[in-house]
């Protein structure tokens, strides 16, 4: 899953990966996505937040980079920001909510690491 050669954070931030990947202390980590069930659920959840964005005071984004620590960047399936949060290209303040849609290939330890990163950053809801 992770590459063996260390990649500088500046290189990660200057490149576009298709699909986007996480950056963990110099290593790129691929994410499990692209299957019909995963994409369908991601779209439905994003749609719920998008339709209610005005009433709830939120903005939802699919696959947005979040800097969870100095050398750690995660790309949740859906990030929900408060309307008042900064609108920077990379999120550096704790979002209101990070959603990870699980795929059959996802493993408990890897998910616990992702969720732990969000909680340590200060995300209240995962």
Place the predicted regions along the sequence by residue.
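Gly/Pro/Ser/Thr-rich low-complexity, intrinsically disordered segments predominantly at protein N-termini
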Residues: 1-125
